[in-house]
């Protein structure tokens, strides 16, 4: 297992050649590359230079073209649900509205799926209409007509300032607005069974392809 980090300079031909030299020096003639779009591009570049590479989709964003599932998505989703369940306990007892920012990097899968699973009152992504005034009105209806003691808003990252929205909720509704950015807690933890099974299936297929000297391919789940 080589491990990795972000390396923008890998786009450069000389850096790719250096990587190939390191691989050959260590007797490595095939790679299974796990990651997202950037990792795929790096794997393709190496395969075009003679290194057998098979790519496996690994990202919590679940936004890789050609596959319905990516390794890590289900675990991140579970982490979000677990966190929101705990927030709901305290929000109910203190009449609060939590504005929860989740990851996704412009993909709305984590926000949409977690909102459905958690039963959140409102979900905001770059594909939904974002109108603060409408959100305030919806929260007033939740409180005054449905007599809800709490509310949960799930928001995709890079959409809005969750702290600013929480402050406005405090000022204009009966709820005490609070914001929380779940951040990298979504990326960690023990993998859930869905991810373990998916990773095992994809790994088996990747190894089979490398044994057949196939290269420049990615594993997909349909």
What residues fall within each predicted segment?
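Short, ordered loop/turn segments at secondary-structure junctions
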Residues: 6-7, 36-38, 51, 56-63, ...
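Accessory alpha-helical/coil subdomains and C-terminal extensions
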Residues: 33-35, 43-45, 72-176, 180
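Glycine-rich oxoanion-binding loops at beta->alpha junctions
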Residues: 1-33, 71-82
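Gly-rich Lys/Arg/Thr-decorated short loops/hinges at beta-loop-alpha junctions or inter-strand turns
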Residues: 1-6, 59-68, 93-94, 119
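Short, high-confidence coil segments that cap the C-terminus of an alpha-helix
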Residues: 28, 148-149, 215
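C-terminal non-catalytic interaction/assembly regions of soluble proteins
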Residues: 161, 169-222
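Glycine/threonine-rich beta-strand-loop-alpha-helix active-site module
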Residues: 49-86
């Amino acid at each position: 297992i080589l491990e990795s980090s972000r390396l923008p300079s890998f786009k450069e031909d000389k850096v790719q050649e250096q990587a190939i030299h390191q691989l050959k020096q260590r007797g490595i003639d095939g790679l299974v590359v796990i990651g997202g779009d950037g990792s795929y591009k790096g794997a393709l570049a190496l395969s075009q230079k003679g290194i057998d590479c098979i790519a496996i989709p690994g990202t919590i964003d679940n936004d890789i073209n050609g596959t319905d599932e990516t390794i890590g998505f289900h675990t991140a989703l579970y982490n979000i649900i677990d966190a929101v369940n705990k927030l709901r306990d305290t929000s109910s007892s203190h009449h609060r509205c939590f504005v929860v920012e989740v990851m996704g990097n412009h993909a709305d899968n984590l926000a949409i799926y977690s909102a459905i699973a958690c039963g959140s009152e409102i979900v905001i992504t770059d594909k939904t209409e974002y109108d603060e005034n409408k959100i305030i009105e919806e929260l007033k209806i939740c409180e005054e007509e449905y007599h809800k003691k709490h509310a949960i808003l799930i928001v995709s990252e890079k959409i809005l300032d969750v702290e600013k929205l929480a402050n406005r909720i405090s000022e204009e509704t009966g709820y005490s607005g609070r914001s929380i950015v779940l951040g990298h807690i979504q990326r960690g933890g023990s993998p859930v069974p869905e991810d373990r099974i998916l990773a095992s299936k994809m790994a088996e297929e990747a190894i089979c392809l490398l044994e057949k000297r196939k290269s420049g391919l990615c594993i997909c789940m349909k």
